[in-house]
Regions:
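Extended catalytic cores of very large enzyme megasubunits
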Residues: 2-176
Length: 176
């Protein structure tokens, strides 16, 4: 069954669609990340309950992931496996929120515009041309599972200081 927290509580999905907040979906997401090898022996229900206790109507699914990862990071002193889950949540969130194509990401960065529609590329024309000339090779060489080699704090450092943003939203993955 689909347990909804409150029929008035809505969540905004990455696609922009709106649906009721579902405790079951939050648990399912956390459990699926725990099942990745090496499997983590963590109570996903406990984390989901902590996340649910702090949500508000209109929260974004990306924010649910951020909150869950933060809760896990705080619990790393209880069990190091929580640190691994925090990493999996935050990196999965990044991958779901960005393009899975390096060349597409470079195109977005190159075609960036300011609020007036003026072209303001975030990568050079030279880089853009090289990537476009070799996009199939470059796209094929990236193994996104390698992103999960970074821990939560390493990812948060990259997010804060290094990953390029478009309109305040991270536009690239760790390997882009």
């Amino acid at each position: 069954t689909n347990t909804n927290i409150n029929t008035n509580m809505k969540v905004i999905k990455r696609s922009g669609s709106i649906e009721e907040v579902s405790f079951d979906k939050i648990i399912k997401r956390l459990r699926s990340l725990c099942e990745v090898e090496p499997k983590l022996d963590i109570d996903a229900t406990d984390i989901a309950q902590q996340v649910i206790s702090e949500i508000c109507d209109g929260i974004k699914t990306t924010e649910l992931d951020e909150e869950a990862a933060k809760k896990c990071a705080y619990m790393v002193t209880i069990d190091p496996a929580y640190g691994e889950l925090a990493s999996r949540i935050i990196i999965s969130n990044n991958q779901k929120s960005t393009s899975n194509s390096f060349s597409e990401t470079v195109t977005q960065l190159y075609n960036n515009t300011d609020i007036h529609g003026k072209s303001v590329p975030l990568v050079s024309e030279g880089l853009y041309k090289i990537v476009m000339d070799h996009k199939h090779k470059l796209n094929d060489v990236i193994d996104y599972s390698r992103d999960f080699g970074f821990d939560y704090f390493a990812y948060k450092t990259l997010e804060r200081a290094y990953l390029i943003k478009i309109n305040g939203k991270i536009a690239e993955t760790i390997q882009h």
